[in-house]
Design a protein with these regions (language model features):
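NTP/phosphate- and nucleic-acid-binding module
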Residues: 1-295
Length: 295
């Protein structure tokens, strides 16, 4: 199927070893793993589209999003999703779509999980397959329609706490990229390249041997914009209700594509030790005194 990879054992084992590096960092930084459904109801997509369109317009015009009304513009993932509209021969009352990412699904649950300042910070992550109808030329590991996706979502008491989370995410990136032996650039994206639903985006680009860059991860600061749309509030220490501030951090199998591009050539691929499916140790065999001196 175009844009949907078949993983053979060697490649899948390598990908799982990369995942293990991420799991380790998540455990160190007190993130908890979750798993959300693949299908999301259509009404949540409409909610996201209205929010993202308004945030995008506000950023372009340099005004506060609260000063704008919801627009009819489709600024979310609507043009990229795969739809499920039938169950057997029966048409569904509410169409479902395959998740392109999980903000809408997760943030529907956050108001049930967050009630007090004692519930913060909330730090969760999942590793799942997501689906986006990528209309451009697909390429294994680099631009696909079924994505092996890591996503971390956090909620915090205020903007400053969320900003500190972004810095922690960047430290996590440093650790993982060091294990993968990938040189990177971390850069705040300009307005036109910021995720439409974010206050700002920091992209992480691997520097490839030909001098070009390949984005391998991204961190987004949402401030309280999504919390207002999904009514995610908490009671602060003064018994007043406030909206949480949120962040996200994502990576995909593009990491493996970067590893292949960096450490492979026409003669083959040399894996970094941390993700090599097979480990080889060369042991010198010493038999004579003369050979001992030589070694």
């Amino acid at each position: 199927i175009k844009g949907m990879d078949v993983w053979r054992p060697y490649g899948w084992k390598t990908m799982k070893l990369i995942d293990s590096l991420t799991h380790k960092q998540m455990e160190i930084t007190d993130h908890e793993e979750v798993n959300f459904p693949l299908l999301i109801p259509e009404n949540l997509l409409e909610k996201e589209n209205a929010l993202v369109a308004r945030l995008k317009k506000a950023r372009e015009e340099g005004v506060d999003p609260d000063e704008l009304r919801d627009e009819d513009e489709e600024g979310g993932f609507k043009k990229e999703v795969y739809w499920v509209k039938h169950a057997g021969e029966n048409e569904l009352d509410i169409p479902m779509f395959l998740r392109p990412t999980s903000e809408t699904a997760m943030y529907t649950m956050f108001p049930l999980w967050i009630r007090s300042h004692k519930d913060l910070p909330l730090k969760i992550y999942q590793m799942v397959n997501t689906f986006r109808y990528e209309t451009k030329q697909t390429r294994s590991f680099i631009r696909v329609r079924e994505i092996h996706f890591f996503e971390a979502h956090t909620a915090h008491a205020d903007e400053q706490c969320a900003t500190r989370q972004i810095q922690q995410d960047l430290n996590i990136v440093d650790n993982i990229m060091n294990d993968l032996c990938l040189p990177i650039i971390k850069a705040k994206r300009p307005v036109w390249d910021t995720f439409p639903g974010a206050w700002y985006t920091i992209g992480i680009d691997a520097i490839m041997p030909n001098g070009r860059t390949l984005q391998v991860a991204s961190c987004h600061h949402y401030r309280d914009q999504w919390a207002k749309a999904f009514d995610i509030t908490y009671e602060n220490i003064e018994a007043k209700q406030e909206h949480v501030h949120q962040t996200t951090y994502g990576m995909s199998e593009r990491l493996l594509g970067a590893v292949v591009g960096m450490h492979g050539d026409d003669n083959g691929l040399i894996m970094p030790p941390s993700i090599a499916p097979f480990q080889i140790v060369i042991c010198p065999m010493i038999r004579k005194n003369a050979e001992v001196d030589t070694v």
